[in-house]
Amino acid sequence: MHAKDGIMVHKFHTSQGWFMSTGPSRKQVKVTVVGAGIVGSAIAYSLARRGAAVTVIDKGRPGAGATSHSFAWINATAKHPVSYHNFNRRSLGMWDRFAKGLGVDVGLRWGGQLEWASTAVGAYELESRAAQLRAWGYPCQLLDAAHMAHIEPGLSPREVTAAIYCELDGMVEPTLAAQACIQAAVKLGAAAKLETQVTDVMNNSSSATVVAGGETIDADVVVLAGGVDNTVLAAMAGITIPQEESPGVVIRTGPIAQPLLSNVSVLYAPSLEPGRPEIHLRQCLDGSAMIGEGSQESLARDDTQAHADELLARAAEYVPALKGAAAIPVPVGYRPMPLDGFPVVGFSPKSPNVYLALTHSGVTLAPLMAQLATMEIIDAAQVDLLSNYRPSRFD
């Protein structure tokens, strides 16, 4: 057992001897990554950096699936229990270095998340959340209306019974990040087979095979990072990975020249009326706004223009700079959501040459999942940090 980057890992015996060889004669590991969303793209890039012979396959373009629908709030604020909170916090802390390594601007911006309540019940909930986050060592300031106005003077918040500011949180443009990962991986020698449908995944005695676009592709390891498609992909290899259906709706605006927020990256505002969802907002790299409602797990299917117009009008009540912007509806997106809500990461005992990488909060978790998956595939490590998230829990 030894430590790497603060993570305890164990070497284990495997029939796949190429894992264990060292020095100049070490065999190059062949890996096929199915899925070029933010998680799959990050894994492909990380593997390519370690010298693996990587082939990435996606039925569409990089970052064009659930990744493109993500609100892309990088955080550990809304994560429970503490073990999962810490898992997300570790990945949050990796984003700066990860993004810089890509060599292009992927819209990574820090500034924190600001949220406020307008009722006594809402204030109690925020106060309780702030206390819990601080107990876990996560900076979270409890604010009154005056302090909130100092941080974001351009808001029109109406009633403020309490507010919290989580300064570590940030945002990124996940499609740009996925595209940059694939481009970087290709520069390192990876092959990208895009707009190519996978029709079979097979585990062999010492390898794994993918059939895609009529072509049979053999590899030492196949990584399944297909998001909502992972349940079907895993079943091809005899692995059970159940997911909940998790539709979500966000809207965008056209580019807005002026900054909508003075300091923070992400804004969460209370409902304007009892029984209506809360509103969340961020301004994208191109100046457009992305707006959603409810929590990041809320289910929504209304992607009509009427809904987009109404949601923008509600957001503009709190953010006057939005007035006059045009609402652009985005088709409903389906988010990866393992049945118990937690990541599914690792080799499956049922198909030991198939590696699963599935999670909600993929934008926050992509750097960490990429690092740990690479360690387990290239170094034959068993990472203790992943022990709660193994595919075998669904067997």
Map each language-model feature to its residues.
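Extreme N-terminal leader/targeting segments of oxidoreductases
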Residues: 1-31, 49
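N-terminal Rossmann-like FAD-binding beta1-loop-alpha1 element of flavoenzymes
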Residues: 30-55
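Active-site substrate-recognition segment that forms the wall
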Residues: 45-49, 72-74, 105-108, 216, ...
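Glycine-rich FAD pyrophosphate-binding loop
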Residues: 49-68
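Dinucleotide-binding Rossmann-like beta1-alpha1 core, especially the glycine-rich loop
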Residues: 71-151, 278, 300, 306, ...
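Helix-loop-beta segment of a Rossmann-like dinucleotide-binding subdomain
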Residues: 106-117, 141-145, 149-188, 294-298, ...
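Helical element adjacent to the flavin cofactor pocket in flavoenzyme catalytic cores
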Residues: 166-218
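C-terminal catalytic lobe of FAD-dependent flavoproteins
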Residues: 310, 316-395
